[in-house]
UniProtKB/Swiss-Prot annotation:
It comes from Strongylocentrotus purpuratus (Purple sea urchin). Disulfide bonds: none annotated. Required for the assembly and/or stability of the 40S ribosomal subunit. Required for the processing of the 20S rRNA-precursor to mature 18S rRNA in a late step of the maturation of 40S ribosomal subunits. Residues 147-176, 188-264 are annotated as: Disordered. Component of the small ribosomal subunit. Mature ribosomes consist of a small (40S) and a large (60S) subunit. The 40S subunit contains about 33 different proteins and 1 molecule of RNA (18S). The 60S subunit contains about 49 different proteins and 3 molecules of RNA (28S, 5.8S and 5S). Interacts with ribosomal protein S21. GO terms for biological process: cytoplasmic translation; ribosomal small subunit assembly. Belongs to the universal ribosomal protein uS2 family. This is Small ribosomal subunit protein uS2. InterPro entries: Ribosomal_uS2, Ribosomal_uS2_CS, Ribosomal_uS2_euk/arc, Ribosomal_uS2_flav_dom_sf. Keywords: Cytoplasm, Ribonucleoprotein, Ribosomal protein. Residues 162-176, 226-243 have a biased composition (Low complexity). Pfam families: Ribosomal_S2 (PF00318). It is found in: Cytoplasm. Gene3D superfamilies: Glucose-6-phosphate isomerase like protein, domain 1.
C-alpha cells in the first residue's frame, strides 16, 4: 500500500499472517529486476487501491502473479484478478477490510476457530496520526502521574492556636458539624466557655486616681508658658482724689493725680 491510510493495516496484516508487507513507496522492478536487492517473487499480491498501486499491479501481470485489490466503484480493474468491493477511501473502512482479511486467512489455516471471537481488536488496523498518537500518550502519562500524587490534607485555620488536621470529609477532628448558627456558641461540644466579665464589680475595684506628678522643667522652652511672677501685697496707697468729670479740663500732659511710680 502506497497510501498512508493503508500502511498501518498492511503492516498489521503481515505481522498476523506472516506475509511480507510493502508499506510506502514501491520500488519499480521489485518483481521483474532480479539484480536488485529488493527483488521479490510473491505467490499473490494484495493491494489497497489499484489506482495508486498501479506499478506493482502492472509488474505482477508480467510475471503471472495473481492480484487481489480493494476496489471502489471508480477503481480501474485492469490486471486485477479478484476485486473486493469496499470503500477504499475511508480510514476505518480500509482498516476493517484488512482486519477481516487477516481473520479469514487465519481461519483458513486453522489457526483460529470460527466459533471463537478473534482476540485482536479492529482498532489496531486503523490509521493513526503520529501527532495525535503522541498527544494521547502524553495525556495518558499525565493522568498516571496525577493518580500517583496524593492530594494534600486540608487543615482548618485557627488564629491563635495550632492548626487542626482536617480529614478527607472536610470536618475537623473533634469538632461537631454545626447546622444552627443561631444557637449558643457555648453549647458546642469541645468549645470552652468564655470568661464571665462583671463590669459592675470591676468598677468598684478601680483605685482612686493618684496625685498628679510634680511638674518638671521641659527642655522645649517654646512649648511651656513662663511661670507667673509672685505678687507681693500692695502697700496702702493714699486716697486719691476723684477724677474730674470735666474731660475738657483734664491735663493730658502729666497733671493726673495717680502716682504711677509707687513701687510694689
Amino acid at each position: 500500500s502506497s497510501r498512508p491510510y493503508g500502511q498501518r493495516a498492511v503492516l498489521k496484516f503481515g505481522a498476523h499472517t506472516g506475509a511480507t508487507p510493502v508499506a510506502g513507496r514501491y520500488t519499480p522492478g521489485t518483481f521483474t529486476n532480479q539484480i536488485q536487492a529488493a527483488f521479490r517473487e510473491p505467490r499473490i499480491l494484495i493491494v489497497t487501491d489499484p489506482r495508486s498501486d498501479h506499478q506493482p499491479v502492472t509488474e505482477a501481470s508480467y510475471v503471472n502473479i495473481p492480484v487481489i485489490a480493494l476496489c471502489n466503484s471508480d477503481s480501474p480493474l485492469r490486471h486485477v484478478d479478484i476485486a473486493i468491493p469496499c470503500n477504499n477511501k475511508s480510514i476505518h473502512s480500509i482498516g476493517l477490510m484488512w482486519w477481516m482479511l487477516s481473520r479469514e486467512v487465519l481461519r483458513l489455516r486453522g489457526a483460529i476457530s470460527r466459533d471463537v471471537t478473534w482476540e485482536i481488536m479492529v482498532d489496531l488496523y486503523f490509521f493513526r496520526d503520529p501527532e495525535e498518537a503522541e498527544k494521547e500518550e502524553q495525556e495518558a502519562r499525565d493522568r498516571a502521574v496525577a493518580v500517583k500524587e496524593e492530594p494534600a490534607q486540608p487543615y482548618a485555620e485557627q488564629w491563635g492556636s495550632d492548626p487542626v488536621a482536617v480529614p478527607a470529609g472536610g470536618q475537623p477532628v473533634g469538632v461537631p458539624d454545626v447546622t444552627d448558627w443561631a444557637a449558643d456558641a457555648n453549647k458546642v461540644a469541645g468549645a470552652p466557655a468564655p470568661p464571665q466579665q462583671q463590669w459592675a464589680n470591676d468598677a468598684s475595684k478601680v483605685a482612686a486616681p493618684a496625685a498628679a506628678p510634680a511638674a518638671f522643667p521641659s527642655e522645649d522652652w517654646g512649648s511651656v508658658d513662663a511661670p507667673a511672677a509672685p505678687v507681693a501685697p500692695a502697700a496702702a496707697a493714699p486716697a486719691a482724689a476723684a477724677p474730674s468729670q470735666d474731660w475738657s479740663t483734664d491735663d493730658w500732659g502729666g497733671a493726673a493725680t495717680n502716682d504711677w511710680a509707687v513701687s510694689s
